[in-house]
Swiss-Prot record:
The FTSH1 precursor is ubiquitinated by CHIP in the cytoplasm. SMART domains: AAA. Keywords: ATP-binding, Chloroplast, Developmental protein, Hydrolase, Membrane, Metal-binding, Metalloprotease, Nucleotide-binding, Plastid, Protease, Thylakoid, Transit peptide, Transmembrane, Transmembrane helix, Ubl conjugation, Zinc. The chain crosses the membrane at residues 204-224. Interacts with CHIP and HSP70. Heterohexamers with FTSH2, FTSH5 and FTSH8. Its main location: plastid. It is found in: Plastid, Chloroplast thylakoid membrane. Ubiquitous. Disruption phenotype: No visible changes in phenotype, probably due to a complementation by FTSH5. The presence of both FTSH1 or FTSH5 (subunit type A) and FTSH2 or FTSH8 (subunit type B) is essential for an active complex formation. The keyword Endoplasmic reticulum does not apply. It is a single-pass membrane protein. This is ATP-dependent zinc metalloprotease FTSH 1, chloroplastic.
Amino acid sequence: MASNSLLRSSSNFFLGSHIIISSPTPKTTRKPSFPFSFVSRAKYQITRSSQDENSPNGKPNSPFSSQVALAAILLSSISSSPLALAVVDEPASPSVVIESQAVKPSTPSPLFIQNEILKAPSPKSSDLPEGSQWRYSEFLNAVKKGKVERVRFSKDGSVVQLTAVDNRRASVIVPNDPDLIDILAMNGVDISVSEGESSGNDLFTVIGNLIFPLLAFGGLFLLFRRAQGGPGGGPGGLGGPMDFGRSKSKFQEVPETGVSFADVAGADQAKLELQEVVDFLKNPDKYTALGAKIPKGCLLVGPPGTGKTLLARAVAGEAGVPFFSCAASEFVELFVGVGASRVRDLFEKAKSKAPCIVFIDEIDAVGRQRGAGMGGGNDEREQTINQLLTEMDGFSGNSGVIVLAATNRPDVLDSALLRPGRFDRQVTVDRPDVAGRVKILQVHSRGKALGKDVDFDKVARRTPGFTGADLQNLMNEAAILAARRELKEISKDEISDALERIIAGPEKKNAVVSEEKKRLVAYHEAGHALVGALMPEYDPVAKISIIPRGQAGGLTFFAPSEERLESGLYSRSYLENQMAVALGGRVAEEVIFGDENVTTGASNDFMQVSRVARQMIERFGFSKKIGQVAVGGPGGNPFMGQQMSSQKDYSMATADIVDAEVRELVEKAYKRATEIITTHIDILHKLAQLLIEKETVDGEEFMSLFIDGQAELYIS
């Protein structure tokens, strides 16, 4: 009866429908109560066409439906896996799944007791989160409730693609949870790892790993491509990033320096030497007929500002041949080997333009003695000078290339660079004499409005030791002062003020000086002037001033002898007088203000006195106890290829004698200055009072005090 009832209810349910018999969706029932192992997931479908054959009119055939239901129940009872019957009426209507759940019989039962429970549950999608992106907590809850069928991990394990029991798909970003795999396994979730798919993070990682190396290689490729294909061609093509291997010399096919030998004054001998080089380039037959060879190099040597570079520009303007010019500091830069490479490139260009002139300014930057410095060794500068030596007079020679170089440090140059065959001539460009300074002043006064009272001969005599650059600066400063004072022309006052500005610095006109300090400075400077005026064979006083200039509170100007400056020869009496004059300021302070009120204003004077006295004993042989012996070396400089410090070549006893002799010379000079000031203290008072009133006294006004006071020269 139970089976007939079941068949009747089933026949009413299945009539006019497609019947699909299949295994139920896994995880619909988490813990089945039957011991069967589910292997097959086959589906059995009884199509609607079978029903239609027995019901031509399309009406439900009750007997046939009953047979279909009976067949389904029979298949369910004998199958090793539970079956599901799906009935679909219309395509738009939802499918109904009828699940047959097997139960373990406790006692023998009729045929249909195994499948007596027939139900059609539908998964509750409301228990699952909405959307395609789940939170990690939602994912764990769904796994524990059996709502997740399978998961697929990304390569890096940061993202999980899941499939729920209702075939919904979602993704979860998972943290580094070591218990996740165990949880999934305990709940029977299928686990797999993605091989072909990647997460968004993986995509960015791949893009980053590919793009940045490609950009780097692309940049290097363009760099070297540009270097090889830039103007000039080859590595280091002109204008390319590899240009550091090429010379940076300036080339002029037809030099237009705007300077000729007519613009060079005060260096007649140097001009003559270089004019011969220019004439050799213009008229080579004149010299080759006599077997003469053109000099390969001329080295211009002289103090800074004497016109070495100006002479080179004049040579370029007069020669009429291609001219290359560069500074020696341009050879050596950041990379190793650049200096030698640039030297080679420079001479390759010069040889292609021969005959030509190559001018290297400040050659001591690369031409210093090799092996210089502590421990010797090799450096980039040595490679550069070695290449320069080879190019100037090496195996291949440099026919037709004349090298001009300038330096103010010939003592540090390598001896191999100075030998004949490289620099055949060393042209000394010295400081100009009086006549030379007059010519230089005339050159630099072109284009300037000068007053009628300007006498270049007097200016030249007041500027002994000035170089051409100093005189140019003098005239320029005078023009600036005239413009500042809103004058139409430059007078002798502007030139005189500019001269003092150059020597001692600008005046501190706004400096507040107390009367006490002004009186102290006036007596200090009057002491220098008084001792200097009464010393025989000493330089005459040119000007005395107590106006602060630079770091000096006052100054006394002496006009040095032109002959003494040019020759460099100083007598013993002159040096002794110089020490006495330097000590005159301290002596005047002691005589007027007392020993307790002397100041530190004489500190520079003491340094000068000590230097002169020690040189007289150690270098000039002016000591009877030491004799005609030079004590001690000149000192070494480790960066000039010399020793770090000179080794003493005398005993401690000799050193004590030197110290005693130096002290004796200083004491003697101090006594002479004291005697002069105490003897002519009245003139000291007059000069100091005049300085307090006028602040500046020139030499002629100062000498008038001696005439009025009938002072006599003090000769010791």
